[in-house]
């Protein structure tokens, strides 16, 4: 599949500092691609190279099959760039609404460059407000709306030019948890209804887990880990990724305090991660029956990834080496991802 967005060898440098350092990122049509990292990681700077609100110091930017920037130069005319930008909507933490204009006037403002009649402007603006669930608030002013409602207006305005890409730059970070989830669910629905590709910039793993199918983790200007959300979630390679994954791998944090020196010679700790949709019965109970053993459950948790419940268990098995191998083989036959837990797994980067 040809990527809809292809960022190749992107570097953005401010003086001696590289805010983005040689990053490669491919985003396919229809993806909800989460770009996550702490403040200062470079995620907003990177994503702003997509619509060239930020020119790279090096690297190339290709969107929808058109190379926009390469070898330090713009590859399209200024007019062409403006047209391309209109097909890339953007929403921010600050809603950037016009306080003296009504909700419908705020949406229509994004269409002022068009040749639509007043009636057509009104019809399209109302349609966009209906998409975001605010048609009944068309004559309200921003000050009369809640934070979540104002962000919905911003989303409607970002969709005014029928973009096929929407960049969400920390758009939910100023909202309370309930409203955040409502906005994320709206973005997810728009992705499905409109085939909209969404680039979700955030420092909150819960936001990525709720709606994204892909993820890139950034640290100090570099993408340190990327790929399918489920794969990265189940097999985080870097310490920062493990930190963001958090809840589902809370077992690792708990087991950091475990006294491994006191384990019996044959005892081993394992982390089991599996889709609850794939498991109809208790895998541990099945294991006990199959191998005539008794696994001790030290930890259990359930996370939800884009609507898919993922279970995590930490178990202790006291078996000889051959039985340990049989246990792992049995669990893997049940679509369980098995990771042996020791101090190296728990603490090493």
Curated annotation (Swiss-Prot):
GO terms for molecular function: ABC-type D-methionine transporter activity; ATP binding; ATP hydrolysis activity. It is a peripheral membrane protein. InterPro entries: AAA+_ATPase, ABC_transporter-like_ATP-bd, ABC_transporter-like_CS, ACT-like_dom_sf, MetN_ABC, MetN_ABC_transporter-like, NIL_domain, P-loop_NTPase. Belongs to the ABC transporter superfamily. Methionine importer (TC 3.A.1.24) family. GO terms for cellular component: plasma membrane. The gene is metN. It is an enzyme of class 7 (translocase). Its main location: membrane. PROSITE patterns: ABC_TRANSPORTER_1, ABC_TRANSPORTER_2, METN. It is found in: Cell membrane. The complex is composed of two ATP-binding proteins (MetN), two transmembrane proteins (MetI) and a solute-binding protein (MetQ). Part of the ABC transporter complex MetNIQ involved in methionine import. Responsible for energy coupling to the transport system. Keywords: Amino-acid transport, ATP-binding, Cell membrane, Membrane, Nucleotide-binding, Translocase, Transport. ATP binds at residues 37-44. CDD domains: ABC_MetN_methionine_transporter (cd03258). Residues 5-245 form the ABC transporter domain. It comes from Lactobacillus gasseri (strain ATCC 33323 / DSM 20243 / BCRC 14619 / CIP 102991 / JCM 1131 / KCTC 3163 / NCIMB 11718 / NCTC 13722 / AM63). It catalyses: L-methionine(out) + ATP + H2O = L-methionine(in) + ADP + phosphate + H(+); D-methionine(out) + ATP + H2O = D-methionine(in) + ADP + phosphate + H(+). Its EC number is 7.4.2.11. This is Methionine import ATP-binding protein MetN. Pfam families: ABC_tran, NIL.
């Amino acid at each position: 599949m040809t990527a809809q967005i292809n960022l190749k060898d992107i570097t953005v440098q401010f003086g001696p500092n590289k805010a983005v350092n040689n990053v490669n990122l491919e985003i396919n049509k229809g993806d909800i691609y989460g770009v996550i990292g702490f403040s200062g990681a470079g995620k907003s700077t990177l994503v702003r190279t997509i619509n060239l609100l930020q020119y790279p110091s090096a690297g190339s930017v290709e969107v929808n099959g058109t190379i926009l920037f390469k070898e330090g130069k713009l590859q399209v005319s200024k007019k062409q760039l403006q047209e391309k930008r209109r097909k890339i909507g953007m929403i921010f933490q600050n809603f950037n609404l016009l306080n003296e204009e009504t909700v419908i006037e705020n949406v229509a403002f994004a269409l002022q460059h068009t040749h639509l009649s007043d009636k057509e402007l009104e019809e399209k603006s109302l349609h966009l407000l209906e998409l975001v669930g605010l048609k009944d608030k068309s004559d309200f002013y921003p000050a009369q709306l809640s934070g979540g409602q104002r962000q919905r207006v911003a989303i409607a305005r970002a969709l005014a030019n029928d973009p096929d890409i929407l960049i969400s730059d920390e758009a939910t970070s100023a909202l309370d948890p309930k409203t955040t989830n409502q906005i994320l669910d709206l973005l997810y629905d728009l992705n499905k209804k409109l085939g909209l590709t969404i680039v979700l910039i955030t420092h909150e793993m819960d936001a990525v887990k709720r709606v994204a199918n892909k993820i890139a983790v950034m640290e100090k200007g570099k993408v340190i880990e990327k790929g399918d959300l489920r794969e990265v979630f189940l097999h985080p390679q870097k310490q920062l990724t493990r930190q963001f994954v958090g809840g589902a791998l809370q077992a690792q944090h708990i087991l950091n305090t475990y006294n491994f020196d006191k384990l019996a010679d044959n005892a081993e700790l394992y982390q089991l991660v599996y889709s609850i949709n794939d498991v109809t019965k208790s895998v541990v109970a099945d294991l006990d029956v199959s191998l005539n053993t008794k696994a001790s459950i030290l930890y259990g948790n359930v996370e939800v990834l884009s609507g898919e419940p993922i279970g995590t268990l930490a178990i202790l098995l006291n078996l000889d080496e051959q039985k340990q191998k049989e246990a792992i083989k049995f669990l893997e036959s049940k679509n369980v991802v098995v990771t042996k837990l020791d101090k190296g797994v728990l603490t090493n980067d």
